[in-house]
Every structure is written in C-alpha cells, then in structure tokens.
C-alpha cells in the first residue's frame, strides 16, 4: 500500500500565489469605508473609522457583557411549536427549523446567570438573526423565567433587546407575551430588584411597547433604531417627511425616551456603576 498519493489534476506552473480575500473585508454602511474584518472584530464590531455599531449575535453579546467563565446559560431546552399551522411564503414550522439550524439556538433569546465585573446578575439577550428576533411564546416564557429568577434570588436583571416585535406567525399567543412579561416586571419592581434594559439595533414593535422601555434604567447603543412602527410606515401614514435621525437612539435621548446612550466599549463598566448606585 502506498503511503503517499499524488493529488489528481495538473500542477500550477504559473508561479503566482493565490490568496483568498473573500470575507476578509467589510464595508461600513455609514462611512462607506472598507475595514479589515479582524480589525472590526477586535474593536467589538464597531467601525474604527466612524464609530458605527454593527449588529452582533446573542452569544457574542453575552460574552462581552458577562465575566469570562463566570456565567451559565439556562432554559435552552424550550422550543416553539406551530399552534396556528401558519403558512405565508412557507410554513412557520420550516422557518423555525431553518432559524434553529442557522443560529444554533432553539429560539430568539439566550438566558444566563453569572457575574458582571464581579456583580451577580441575571441576563436575557435577544438574537435578531432568529426570525428577526421576534417574540413568540418561547421568547416570552424565557424572559419571564429570567425575571422570576431575578426576583427569587433578589439579583439584578439585564435584558438586551434586538427585535422586530411580536411574532405574527403565533398570532394572539405572541401578543399575550407583552402583558405576561410586563406583569412579571411589575412584581420585580415591587420587590425593588433593579432592572436594566439595553436597547440595540433594531428594537421595534411589541418589544419596544413592553419590556424594552420598562427598565429602571433604559440604555441604548449609539445609532440604534428604536420605535414601534418603522419610519417608512410612519411617513406613508402621516404623509410627511420625518426629522433627520428620527427613531435613532440619540434622537430618543434628546426627547426624554432614554436615560443614556452608551458605546459598546463602555457598556459593561457603565452597567456595573449603575448597579453599585442602585444598591447604595
């Protein structure tokens, strides 16, 4: 038996070295500059040229927010069903399977319990890549469980939102989650357990209309789209041009809808200081 085999095909005798560059560069949608992907990732997925905050997945977000090797994920066994047998361009059940395959998650949120700069916290982080981060029965149940876990342990709660709103494929079951989570947060508030809401790009629809805006402290990342209906829908409805920057986090801060706009690099220490202040 031969130990070595010559690969089939002709040898490249041109003397030219082929270097693959596909996927190594990213174009910033804001400043239109070309960025080396490694530089972008090392800068926490924030454009080093203009400061635009790129969207990041829930696992990356969780790793940035909580201390390394100091947290565990929870409730990851819950999975949505298809109560209405909903079909649009394709069956909802197929959309679920595809989203689960693409993200490696059961649904659009990750629950965790751990430490943030040494401070114990309970966290829920939404995954926009899972059907637009939409909120169905499982998302509602998981966030409610996080609230109740924070309540039982008297541990501060952090929810990071990234969502297009209620999941239409689950109908009224999805809409019920707004009230369910809000009621749980009311119990948390009554017990005087801190709740910090972090709104990222985008946070819209029923998520904005419920738990995302109910924090003791509502923080947003720079440039995040935050609102109920999207700006295009509003313009078509009122037949007027909206102001520049409308529904962006800086606009909302200027008009009293947010407590702070905090860059991604500063978010973790900012929350830590806020928790210390609330505990004082």
Where are these regions (language model features)?
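Residues immediately within or flanking Cys/His clusters that coordinate Zn2+
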Residues: 25, 44
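Short, small/acidic-rich helices and loops at N termini and domain boundaries
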Residues: 45-49, 55-56
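Cleft-lining beta-strand/loop regions that shape enzyme active-site pockets
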Residues: 110-189, 196
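An N-cap/entry alpha-helix motif that binds or orients negatively charged groups
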Residues: 8-18, 26-27, 54-111
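Cys/His-rich microdomains that often coordinate metals
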Residues: 34-35, 53-54
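Conserved catalytic cores of soluble enzyme domains
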Residues: 161-279
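Short cysteine-rich clusters marking metal-coordination/redox-active sites
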Residues: 28-31, 47-50
């Amino acid at each position: 038996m031969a130990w070595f085999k010559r690969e089939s095909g002709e040898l490249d005798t041109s003397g030219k070295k082929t270097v693959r560059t596909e996927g190594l560069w990213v174009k910033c949608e804001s400043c239109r500059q070309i960025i080396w992907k490694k530089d972008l990732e090392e800068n926490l997925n924030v454009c080093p040229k203009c400061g635009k905050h790129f969207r990041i997945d829930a696992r990356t977000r969780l790793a940035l927010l909580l201390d390394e090797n100091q947290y565990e994920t929870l409730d990851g066994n819950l999975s949505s069903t298809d109560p209405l047998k909903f079909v649009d361009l394709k069956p909802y059940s197929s959309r679920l399977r595809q989203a689960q395959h693409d993200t490696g998650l059961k649904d659009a949120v990750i629950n965790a319990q751990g430490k943030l700069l040494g401070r114990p916290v309970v966290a829920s982080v939404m995954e926009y890549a899972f059907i637009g981060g939409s909120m169905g029965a499982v998302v509602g149940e998981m966030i409610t469980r996080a609230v109740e876990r924070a309540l039982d342990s008297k541990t501060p709660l952090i929810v990071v939102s990234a969502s297009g709103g209620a999941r239409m494929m689950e109908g009224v079951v999805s809409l019920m989650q707004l009230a369910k989570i809000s009621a749980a947060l009311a119990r948390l508030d009554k017990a005087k357990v801190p709740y910090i809401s972090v709104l990222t790009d985008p946070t819209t629809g029923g998520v904005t209309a419920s738990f995302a805006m109910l924090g003791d402290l509502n923080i947003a990342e720079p440039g995040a789209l935050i609102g109920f209906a999207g700006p295009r829908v509003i313009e078509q409805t009122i037949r007027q041009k909206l102001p520049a920057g409308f529904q962006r986090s800086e606009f909302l801060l200027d008009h009293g809808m947010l407590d702070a706009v905090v860059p991604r690099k500063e978010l973790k220490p900012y929350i830590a200081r806020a928790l210390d202040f609330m505990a004082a």
